[in-house]
């Protein structure tokens, strides 16, 4: 994994995300910063991560989300071998329930 992906622009975006306080604020920011296609892609990746984390078979995830198995496999790879962001958020959401 390339270590040079994080720069001051990425950090600035992360800081912007950290000031959002509500779901509506987050939705408004995401809609302003992303095209509808980008937003749909992000939301599908997130749903794929949730389903894979829950143990749903990849083919079923792909079918349910109308995504390719390649996309689901890529999400699963990042879930298991990425920076830990998916897992961190999933665990925090589980702890809130």
Predicted features and spans:
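Short, amphipathic alpha-helical "recognition" segments used to contact nucleic acids or chromatin
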Residues: 42-56
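Short acidic alpha-helix initiation/capping motifs at coil-to-helix transition points
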Residues: 4-9, 40, 52-53
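Short, Lys/Arg-enriched anionic-surface-contact patches
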Residues: 25-44, 97
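Short alpha-helical "recognition helix" segments of helix-turn-helix
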Residues: 60-65
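A general alpha-helix detector
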Residues: 9-13, 29, 47, 71
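Amphipathic alpha-helical interaction elements
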Residues: 18, 22, 50-53, 77-81
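General nucleic-acid-binding
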Residues: 1-20
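C-terminal structural segments of small proteins and small subunits
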Residues: 14, 66-93
């Amino acid at each position: 994994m390339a270590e040079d992906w994080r720069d001051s622009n990425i950090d600035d975006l992360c800081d912007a995300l950290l000031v959002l306080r509500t779901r509506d604020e987050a939705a408004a920011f995401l809609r302003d910063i992303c095209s509808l296609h980008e937003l749909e892609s992000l939301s599908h990746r997130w749903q794929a991560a949730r389903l894979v984390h829950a143990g749903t078979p990849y083919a079923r995830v792909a079918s349910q989300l109308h995504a390719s198995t390649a996309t689901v496999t890529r999400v699963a790879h990042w879930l298991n071998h990425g920076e830990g962001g998916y897992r961190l958020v999933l665990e925090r959401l589980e702890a809130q329930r």
